């Protein structure tokens, strides 16, 4: 088994949680918390944090959008064009101006000045339209004049459609006789950018132009074809679930469905509306995704199950909230698939195609959307998902371009994208993935459309705080277990076997990465000890051991109840067998308590199977025999040594594994798929060394067996084997995720 891990990541220093804005800077604290007298207060804080997070499942909080609220405030009454339809919005604008004269979101990012300018000007227009708030208008105009240079500043984030909408609102301001004293050069630059944007749109395909102009309808003025805009009206009466666009449409057309949507939003939110409504499905999926990626989902399993069930119902119903938004569709597809729900890729790939054709123009795509689509496209489970493969390749190219062009302004997001491209979800151990998420986590996860908006479900310091504390708790347990493993290694005298690789640190790291939860200590120790032993036995058969020693070890395991002082042919065999027997008995005793039946004989049989196959490989090498590729794979997927490492641990993770389950074809299929993938990956990497040493190797044998009269090139053979690995990996993932007789938590271990 060839897994590359950073040992320090799993048994090294802990994360500091006192300062959590950048968790990656907090890897310098030891075990103080585990022994601190403040443990009680830490535990209380831990539970309080869990409680706050749990409440998010029952209330979807969205930040107020001053921009959208201003546009809703401009809507006239359906019975009188001289009166506002939503006076509560006007009152909210009057009462919520900032001290500097702007209408900015609290604690907004310093790179969102364009957003603040746009929102402030929209609020000014709303107040002026209805002849109220003279003082607020004056202060707002002063803010716009003072900060007008930011409208063309390159370092600022540009909201969707800003270069068209903001100049249009300036025109409206002049039409309302608002006296704005604007710097001429900046104003000319802004007008030039607007004309350039309009020209670029006119040169794009008509469908993309049409949907983009519909999204920014409030900024198009006389250029807007309102009848074409209404093609995008949704069942809830909105245009793109956007209060501002829908408000502009009602002002232009007096469409009753638009008005009903606005009434619905006001009834839900009161006097101010968000930038997007509804956003319930996406918001809840973001919450689930955050908890899963940060490794704390197990604390909220009931709530998460409810979200997944609701989302699946919406998926089956073809809910617009999922399928009319690429990010929501991608997140739903990935989350549902990875949690075992049956969702085909057809609907998702259509959403991706729409994203890159007409439904979501390039003006509106951001890196977060592309990244979300890319992550979803990785979840390929079936051999015939050709379109999903194509979209995966396309999305990868787009993200690579974003990285190489340096267009990603956030260093944290840049690191997340790079990590996603470097490590497919299946190529990084779960514990390592959680650590990376903590390191790169930003809890101020602001989203940008025509204006900025956020929700505590998008990013939240409580998520990070709970994750860091949980990580540290697990780390403390892992360190204690590692000390126990170190002691065991020496007590069993395995450290005296100088020919063997001293791999117990590596072995424990793979165990901790596979079973992070504190309660799975027995499974971790079983995995780690058997991993150490299989490495030593492998070295005995491959490097040091004589034929007599190999045969003797096999005989000892077959007989089992033997006197090691008289029946071992060498000191090395005595040490190995003694450690092996005591470890199997220890695991058997622990397994008996959980399973209610003896599992020792099965563990012995697993070990014997490996030893027999290792002996066969040893004989091939000794006799310089060349097996066929089929003969080799039949033996080598067992001799890879994963059986003794993985299979005994299944008995220790909690659920009962009956004899019928262990004998079931699915159990054996899971093992064969996992071990075959690992064997092929290992043989590709170790090709040169094993060929030089005269040992059978899958890549070498495949070159001979598949090349006809001429040996296949190494590169071509690697490509063929990688395709085979990918097919096997998909089948393995599919088998793990599908409902079956084997408990899910046991099946998931085969995917580690």
From Swiss-Prot:
Positions contributing to Mg(2+) 3 binding: 682, 690
Cofactor note: Binds 3 Mg(2+) ions per subunit.
Organism superkingdom: Eukaryota
Pathway entry: Secondary metabolite biosynthesis; terpenoid biosynthesis
Free-text tissue specificity from the UniProt record: Highly expressed in leaves.
Localisation per UniProt entry: Plastid, Chloroplast
Main EC class the enzyme belongs to: lyase
Transit peptide stretch: 1-28
Gene3D superfamilies the record matches: 1.50.10.160, Farnesyl Diphosphate Synthase, Terpene synthase, N-terminal domain
Assigned keywords, A-Z: Chloroplast, Lyase, Magnesium, Metal-binding, Plastid, Transit peptide
Entry EC no(s): 4.2.3.-
Molecular function, one GO term: terpene synthase activity
Coarse class of the protein's main subcellular location: plastid
Motif (DDXXD motif): 538-542
Positions bound to Mg(2+) 1: 538, 542
InterPro entries found in the cross-reference section: Isoprenoid_synthase_dom_sf, Terpene_synth_N, Terpene_synth_N_sf, Terpene_synthase-like, Terpene_synthase_metal-bd, Terpenoid_cyclase/PrenylTrfase
Cofactor(s) the protein needs: Mg(2+)
One GO CC term on file: chloroplast
Residues annotated to bind Mg(2+) 2: 538, 542
GO biological process: ent-kaurene metabolic process; gibberellin biosynthetic process; terpenoid biosynthetic process
Comment field (misc): Abietane diterpenoids (e.g. miltiradiene, abietatriene and ferruginol) accumulate specifically in the periderm of roots. The ent-kaurene diterpenoid oridonin, main constituent of Isodon rubescens, accumulates in leaves.
Family: Belongs to the terpene synthase family.
Protein purpose: Involved in the biosynthesis of ent-kaurene diterpenoids natural products such as oridonin, miltiradiene, eriocalyxin B and nezukol, known to exhibit antitumor, anti-inflammatory and antibacterial activities. Catalyzes the conversion of ent-copalyl diphosphate (ent-CPP) to ent-isopimaradiene like compounds.
Record remark on domains: The Asp-Asp-Xaa-Xaa-Asp/Glu (DDXXD/E) motif is important for the catalytic activity, presumably through binding to Mg(2+).
Protein's recorded name: Kaurene synthase like 2, chloroplastic
Gene name as annotated: KSL2
């Amino acid at each position: 088994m060839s897994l590359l891990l950073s040992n320090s990541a799993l048994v090294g220093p802990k994360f500091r949680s006192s300062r959590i804005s950048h968790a990656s800077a907090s890897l310098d604290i030891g075990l103080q918390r585990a022994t601190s007298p403040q443990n009680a207060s830490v535990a209380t804080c831990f539970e309080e944090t869990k409680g706050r997070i749990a409440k998010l499942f029952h209330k979807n909080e969205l930040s107020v959008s001053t921009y959208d609220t201003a546009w809703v405030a401009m809507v006239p009454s359906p019975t009188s064009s001289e009166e506002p339809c939503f006076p509560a919005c006007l009152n909210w604008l009057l009462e919520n101006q900032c001290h500097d004269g702007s209408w900015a979101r609290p604690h907004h990012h310093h790179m969102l000045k364009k957003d603040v300018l746009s929102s402030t000007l929209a609020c000014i227009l709303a107040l002026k339209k209805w002849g109220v708030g003279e003082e607020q208008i004056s202060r707002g105009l002063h803010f716009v004049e003072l900060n007008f240079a930011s409208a063309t500043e390159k370092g600022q984030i540009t909201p969707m459609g800003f270069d068209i909408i903001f100049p249009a609102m300036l025109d409206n301001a002049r039409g309302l006789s608002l006296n704005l004293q604007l710097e001429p050069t900046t104003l000319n630059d802004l007008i030039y950018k607007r004309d350039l944007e309009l020209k670029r749109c006119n040169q794009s395909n008509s469908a993309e132009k049409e949907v983009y102009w519909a999204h920014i309808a409030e900024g198009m003025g006389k250029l807007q074809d309102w009848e074409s805009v209404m093609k995008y009206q949704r069942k809830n009466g909105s245009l793109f679930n956007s209060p501002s666009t829908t408000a502009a449409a009602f002002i232009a057309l007096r469409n009753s469905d638009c008005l009903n949507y606005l009434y619905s939003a006001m009834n839900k939110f009161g006097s101010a509306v968000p930038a997007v409504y509804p956003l319930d499905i996406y918001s809840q999926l973001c919450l689930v995704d955050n908890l899963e990626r940060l490794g704390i989902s197990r604390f909220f399993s009931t709530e998460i199950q409810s979200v997944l069930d609701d989302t699946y119902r919406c998926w089956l119903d073809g809910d617009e909230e999922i399928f009319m938004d690429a990010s929501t569709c991608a997140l739903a597809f990935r989350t549902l698939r990875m949690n075992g729900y049956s969702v085909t890729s057809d609907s998702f790939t259509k959403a991706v195609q729409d994203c890159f054709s007409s439904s979501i123009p390039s003006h509106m795509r951001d890196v977060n959307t592309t990244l979300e689509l890319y992550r979803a496209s990785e979840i390929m489970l079936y051999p015939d998902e050709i379109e999903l493969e194509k979209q995966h390749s396309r999305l990868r190219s787009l993200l690579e371009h974003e990285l190489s062009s340096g267009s990603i302004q956030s260093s944290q997001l840049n690191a997340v994208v790079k990590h996603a491209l470097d490590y497919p979800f299946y190529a990084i151990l779960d514990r390592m993935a959680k650590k990376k998420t903590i390191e790169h986590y930003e809890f101020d996860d602001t989203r940008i459309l025509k204006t900025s908006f956020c929700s505590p479900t998008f990013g939240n310091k409580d998520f990070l705080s709970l994750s860091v504390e949980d990580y540290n708790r697990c780390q403390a347990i892992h360190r204690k277990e590692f000390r126990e493993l170190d002691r065991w290694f020496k007590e069993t005298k395995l450290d005296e076997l100088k020919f063997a690789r001293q791999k117990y640190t590596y072995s424990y790291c793979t165990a901790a990465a596979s079973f992070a939860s504190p309660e799975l200590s027995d499974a971790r120790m079983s995995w780690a000890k058997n991993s150490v032993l299989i490495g030593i036995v492998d070295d005995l058969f491959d490097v040091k051991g004589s034929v007599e020693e190999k045969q003797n070890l096999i005989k000892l395991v077959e007989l089992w109840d033997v006197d090691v002082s008289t029946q071992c042919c060498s000191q090395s065999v005595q040490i190995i067998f003694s450690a092996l027997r005591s470890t199997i008995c220890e695991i058997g005793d622990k397994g008996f308590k959980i399973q209610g039946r003896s599992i020792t004989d099965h563990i012995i049989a697993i070990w014997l199977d490996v030893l027999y196959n290792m002996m066969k490989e040893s004989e091939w090498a000794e006799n310089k025999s060349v097996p066929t590729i089929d003969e080799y794979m039949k033996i080598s997927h067992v001799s890879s040594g994963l059986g003794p490492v993985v299979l005994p641990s299944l008995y220790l993770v909690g659920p009962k594994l009956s004899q019928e389950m262990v004998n079931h074809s699915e159990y054996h299929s899971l093992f064969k798929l996992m071990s075959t993938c690992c064997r092929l990956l290992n043989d590709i990497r170790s090709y040169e060394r094993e060929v030089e040493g005269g040992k059978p190797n899958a890549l070498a044998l495949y070159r001979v067996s598949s090349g006809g009269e001429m040996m296949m090139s190494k590169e071509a053979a690697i490509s063929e084997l990688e395709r085979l690995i990918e097919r096997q990996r998909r089948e393995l993932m599919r088998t793990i995720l599908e409902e079956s007789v084997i408990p899910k938590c046991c099946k998931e271990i085969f995917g580690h």
